[in-house]
Amino acid sequence: MACSYISASLSGPIRRHKDRAQNNATTNINPRTQASLRLRLVDMSNSEQALDSANEAVNIASKEAPNPPFAPQHILVTGGAGFIGANFVHGVARNHPQVHMTVLDALTYAGKRENLDGVPAANLTFVHGNICDAELVESLFSGLNQRSAAAVPPIGAIVHFAAESHNDNSILDASPFLNTNVTGTYVLLEAARRHDIRFHHISTDEVYGDLALDEPRKFTELSPYKPSGPYSASKAASDHLVRAWHRTHGLKTTISNCSNNYGPYQHVEKFIPRQITNILAGIRPKLYGPGLAVRDWISVEDHCSAIWTILTRGRIGETYLVGANGEYNNIDVLRMILKLMGRDANDFDHVNDRPGGDKRYAIDATKLQTELGWAPRYTDFEEGLAATIDWYRAHENWWMPDKAGTEEKYRKQGH
């Protein structure tokens, strides 16, 4: 085994004011001043144009020097055996071999210990347990560090991936989402507060609700929260907890809200791997409703590089949206997959749409790109899909055990 393993039970006026903000921009506008500027601009009008003007003015005025670079030596990664978490762990081990990671994961249906195979022992301690277990979480900062202090430095940051995330499941039973996404986040925040640990919270663009299909607007850090379903509501609640612990307790926090990810290790219940594995398993792909809903796709590797950038260079107390300008509607994505896998463009079945399904997500990542210098590397979506298809084709033993049960669950739901 390639790591330590611990088992636990575990308009006009707006235009003039925006110009004034541009002309008076300084190199040191603090967050409170930024917030005041936002409010003055937005209060002048209820229109989306006012909000866009506020965004632009604050981006121009916000030239405050970033925090000194943060160089963590030991990170607690919650949910590190899941889809995005595992990709993050692999990426950190590959690109920052001096960093040790303690992965805390409950190994629910969507997480697998084998997702971390190949991570060097020097980089990884695996703990099987639940983030809602406050005693276990506390032991990671006391007992674990005491036992391994000679070899592993103390935990200096938490990167919090652990979450229930599948919308369909939240519609059937929201309780695991409230427990993990809200209570679990609270437990981790309290541990971080007690030990003065930096805390990066992984969230979703779904907290902002959805956008109309025919409008050019995208989500920004100033977009209002309008969650549409139980999953996004639970993530919105967790975001607010993180902000409250920063303001009330002075906890060093950052938040990232990302668009839809694709890539290796994603469970077959998700849209892209479901279509790919259906074709590989000889099942006709399934498309919710007419397939006109738009998602903003990003490679999971790009998402993980953005997280590292925010963790190490982001300003404390700030939120950063992560996206790669990858807007496609679902039917076009499915037809890309069909083409790449040598199938007819109409070789799929329409099934019942998801109740309350969101129309469109779209991320404006300007703040992350201009303030921290991050940019996506994998911008050819079709090329990324081809690589993802290759991964699932080569890892049938990884996904096949989950396939039949997942499709049966969808069949019962009419999907």
Residue ranges of each PLM-predicted region?
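The catalytic Tyr-centered alpha-helix of NAD(P)H-dependent dehydrogenases
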Residues: 227-234, 264, 268-272, 296-300
